[in-house]
Each structure stands twice: as C-alpha cells, then as structure tokens.
A protein has these predicted regions:
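Primarily recognizes the serine-hydrolase "nucleophile elbow" in alpha/beta-hydrolase
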Residues: 112, 116-185
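Catalytic nucleophile-loop/oxyanion-hole region of alpha/beta-hydrolase
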Residues: 81-85, 101-130, 233-238
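Short beta-strand element of the alpha/beta-hydrolase
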Residues: 66-75
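Conserved alpha/beta-hydrolase "acid-adjacent" motif
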Residues: 197-206
C-alpha cells in the first residue's frame, strides 16, 4: 500500500478507493474501538503462534438476531486489503440491518482462519446477538476464493471438523479466477468487470453456468469497462450491486 493520508490511500491490485468511505470506516472503528475487534484464537494459541494475535474479526453490528455475513478482502494472499475490499461491504451490510464481520486473516493460512471465524461466530452467536443460521460468505479476489471454498459443504466440514455448522446460504464473490465446480457448492452470486486483467469475466461466467447446470442457484453480472478490485463500485456502472447481492442472499436463505 501507499499514501500519506486517507485521501491518498492506494492498495496494490485495487481501483476506485473512495476516500469518503475510508474516512467513514475509520470514524466507525474509532467510535466502536472498545468492542469492534473480536479475537478468534485463545491466548494459548496466540502464544504458540504470535501471528494469530493480528488475526480476528471486525464486527459491524446490525439488528439483534439478524443473520450474519463474513466479508473477506483480497490481496493475492500477500496482504489483506480490508479498507477497500471488506470493511466497506461490512459497513453497508450493517446499515441494511445485517450483522457483518470483516476477517483479518493470515495470508499463508487464510482458509484455516476463515474456518475458525465461522466456528467462532457459530459458537458465540447468542453472545454476539446474531442468528447462527442463514449466513453468507463474501469475498473479493483472493477473498472470493476463500468464500467459495468454505461455502462448499465438504470443505466446510474438512476445515472446521464440525458437522453441526450449517453450510452457508450464499456465496457472494467478486473478481476471482476460481473455477472449481462441485455439487456441494453453495448458491453463488458473482460480479466482475469486463476489463479485469487479473480475473477473466468469462472464467467466472463459465463457472456459474456449470453451477447452474448442477441445479445450484446463481446470478452473474459483468460490468462493462471496469477493472479489477472495484469494491462497492461507488460512482461506477457497478454501483448498487451490493443490494442485488443481498436480495440474492435473502432468496436463498
């Protein structure tokens, strides 16, 4: 990343970072500093692996008892681009009444961390004030791969070791080249730009067509001219896609 001020923030592989949204997020985090971050690993686990100290969930609260979403930023498994690729999504979902969590994961152990995050929320649902059923997994780029993998019923069991955790109701994914298809995949909403030089819109479209052929609900959007990493797409042709994704989630809950 680069930039000396919030207005100048730049993240590798991302476009259209909105300074106003960045400021809004920082103000939200400051206002909720005492309760916004949740540790998902125990103190003993963090002592054994110090990197786990920087791993956890930022909680953007919605309505009590509402379903939850876990948002996973991309960053090519080199870093976590949360300020543009998960915090804005989580904040907007909370404004719509949903309980949203943005995961800060270890790039080398991303799938393990997402599995732990889902387990943590499931086991602490009452304490957190969220519904443990009907949840969704969101992600952009590398984060979309994470959402797709943990959205698969078989991988969910393999990575959590738990049979009591339900499969996600929907996977909401942006701009990724993930192309694995399985009958155990969840309902999937995908969006991408036609000028994405990293994740081909055709690859995403073909995957969703294959899922549809298996009887899995899908919805696909390719936005003309948009590059990789457009986030919420504020002021762009993709603006408002997040509400379409929420509708898809609700239809499959």
């Amino acid at each position: 990343w680069s930039g000396e001020t919030l207005e100048d923030l730049r993240l590798v592989w991302y476009n259209y970072i909105d300074p106003d949204k960045t400021v809004e997020i920082c103000n939200y985090l400051k206002a909720h500093a005492d309760s916004v971050f949740l540790d998902i690993y125990t103190e003993s686990e963090k002592q054994d692996d110090p990197q786990k100290r920087n791993t956890g969930l930022f909680f953007f609260r919605g309505n009590p008892g509402a379903p939850f979403a876990v948002c996973n930023a991309g960053g090519a498994f080199a870093y976590v681009g949360a300020m543009h690729d998960s915090f804005p999504h989580a904040l907007e979902l909370s404004k719509l009444g949903y309980n949203a969590f943005a995961l800060i994961y270890r790039p080398d152990d991303a799938y393990e961390d997402l599995a732990r995050a889902i387990t943590y929320i499931h086991d602490h649902a009452d304490e957190l004030g969220v519904s443990a059923s009907g949840y969704s997994l969101w992600g952009g780029s590398a984060g979309a791969r994470m959402a797709a993998v943990l959205g698969n019923a078989n991988y969910l069991y393999q990575l959590t070791g738990r049979e009591d955790i339900p499969q996600t109701s929907a996977v909401i994914m942006q701009y990724t080249g993930y192309n694995t298809v399985s009958p155990q995949d969840a309902a999937t909403y995908a969006c991408v730009g036609t000028s994405d030089g990293i994740a081909s819109w055709r690859t995403m479209q073909r995957r969703l067509q294959s899922l549809s052929a298996l009887g899995i609900p899908t919805e696909f959007h390719a936005y003309n001219g948009l590059p990789h990493g457009f986030g919420l797409g504020t002021g762009m042709v993709a603006e408002g896609w997040i509400k379409d994704a929420v509708r898809f989630w609700e239809e499959n809950r």
